[in-house]
Amino acid sequence: MLVCAGTCAVAAVRGGETSDGKSTATTEGQTEEYKNWIELGIGGVITSGDRAQFEQEHRLPGDQPYGGIQDLHFEGPLGKDGLFSVDGHALWDFNDYDITVQLSKPKLGYIKAGFTEFRSWYDGNGGFFPHNDVFFPPTFPEMHIDRGEAWIELGLRVPDLPEITIRYTHEFRDGQKDSTIWGDTNLTGLPVNPTRKIVPAFRDIDETRDIFAFDALKTFGNTDVNLGMRYEHSTIDDSLNLERGAGQLPPVVPPPGAQRFITQRDVNNLDLFSGHAITETRIRDWLWFTAGYSYTTLGSDIGGSRVIGTHFDADFGEPVPTLRPFDHGFINLAGTSQVAEHIFNANVLWMPLKDLTVLTAFRYTHDDRESDSTFLATDSTPNVPPFTPSNPQGGAHPITPVPVAANASVDYNRFGQRLEMRYDGLANWLFYAAGEWEEEFGNRLEHQSEAEEAGFELLDVNEDTSLLCQKYITGVNWYPMMRLNLSAQYYHKTASYDNDINAAIHQRLAGEDWTTDDFNIRITCRPKIPACLGTLALVTRYDFVHTTIDSQWAVFSDEELLNEKQSGVIKQHVISEALTWNPLARFYLQANFSYVLNQTDTPANNINLIPNTSPTVVNFRNDYWTVTSGVGYLINDKTDFHVDYSFYCANDYFKNPAVAVPYGSGATEHTVSASITRQLTKNTRLLLRYGYFNYRDVTSGGHNNYQAHSLYSGLQVRF
């Protein structure tokens, strides 16, 4: 980001005071300390191409000026020993605001309040289909969500009394953002299986949350006790908006067409209460014990609907001439859910020897969840003669909504343990090892009433679940010389999921095993080079991760338990190098390079979609490399110059439109910035910065490409 906050360094002993707090006369030769400052800034960005993509990536508004107070700090005495302070910033056309006001008094406490708001931008573009270059412009090309909170906090800090903190917070999230649940179209030009989900979709977001928190901390001898509680009330009213059969209207297709708009509204009113108690006891300097317990209960009321119409936010019952058979939806959703969770943990830190540290931990969790809901299921059936404008041939009409009820419950117990040991008894060596174990046992029940005429079949699931996780870690740090150190680590992790299914329909996962091995090594070197070349530091790191996934399914309609099959193999190599070079006291150079090779292999890559011979699902690749660098030069005691450059490249795009939507990132990005800072006076500093951005994206067919030029100027005044 080109907007740079002003910074300041506050000395440990303020000017005009000695270390014992007594005032002294400030001489002319002493440097005056400024406790307060304000930084004013103004800037702007000129973009060409996809402005929304630039805004999403760099969180800067495009093609408009912005500015205001970039950073502010003011403090002053209040009464005899109190302190008043204000911190914040405010940028117009950026929707970035933050202010904190605090009053504090030693041996009494404080009160502070604040408000924060910031904006995140989103690009509304959907998918791109390279066959015939099919692309649907989004309903809203540029979207944003404003997030913020207003809060007040009171703290009591009276000696010999518990430290009490009370805080109230109101949070909000409001706006629109893109969704990757894309709509579909068959206007792709393919002769076989032409339908693809590439049509952009978006979400309307309207969420608020009120939080009240209370904490009390008190020390009794060698034991610290913390008690606290938290209450939350959340209100969520969001919606998903997508198209089906986009563009499929006469005369492109035969009447009546198939374009329709779906609005799925999700409503949730939630109340949460949690309480906790934590103790920390220092039995001896070499033996500590901590324990904690928390209880959380959550209740929510849900509502919503899924309505198909000729436009977004349509009312149920409006005529839809383009309605298609089996357009499922629902209305009048109502339901409740309850969650109760208990967590207990205990930890022991033991240092039996000077060079040996042992940490043990235990955690128990009990979780109980129940939910019930009812709704009216909607569906459609093909039109029959006589055909009319409101009952067109080839269209469909809605059926009478059918009531459906569903409920589910989950109950499980989870146990976790950890043992960690560290030993540094050998000179220049540190050895460590750890083991983590987790066991879970539970039961899942799901039921949904049958409504075949609306596309809902009977669902009845009863399964006992179990999980066993193990992770073993070992590592070593070696410091053979002042200018060289090495670190190596290896871990092995397994996770075994086992579902004992008592009742179900169709296909269910009966068991799955994940096995991960990770090895990484880091070398830090500061080679001795000729003094005329300054100093040099190098950090080299290599990381290898290998994961296998073995799965087993049961097909209950055939009463068959399938053989276990390796369903996935994930391999990842990460190579990185960092360099810092200071050839002169006034000059430095930093560079970082990383290369990632990541591939996921599944049996699906051997499946060909008839009549084509291309694989429907290819191995997923996420290979990319990045370069970041920076150069700084101190021109004189009042002026310094900086240049930064970053580069990103991913070449994972695979073009197989005949059988799928081409996925995989194929993008290249360059970012360059240059800044100069000038100390105008002893309390005034000026900053000028220029930035250039260039982004090219193959996956989007170039629709996400952009170039941008940014200018920013900031003036900091200390007082």
Region annotations inferred by a language model:
Residues 32, 63-70, 93-97, 144-150, ...:
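Residues that define the transmembrane beta-barrel architecture of outer-membrane proteins
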Residues 38-42, 86, 101, 111-113, ...:
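Membrane-embedded beta-strand positions of outer-membrane beta-barrel proteins
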Residues 42-48, 56, 61, 66, ...:
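Transmembrane beta-strands of outer-membrane beta-barrel pores
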Residues 45, 678-679, 707-719:
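Outer-membrane beta-barrel "beta-signal"
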Residues 79-85, 107-111, 161-164, 174, ...:
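Repeated loop/turn-to-beta-strand initiation elements of outer-membrane beta-barrel proteins
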Residues 74-78, 103-105, 156-158, 218-220, ...:
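Residue-level signature of outer-membrane beta-barrel architecture
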Residues 12-80:
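Outer-membrane beta-barrel initiation region
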Residues 125-136, 177-200, 237-266, 301-334, ...:
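Solvent-exposed loop segments that connect transmembrane elements
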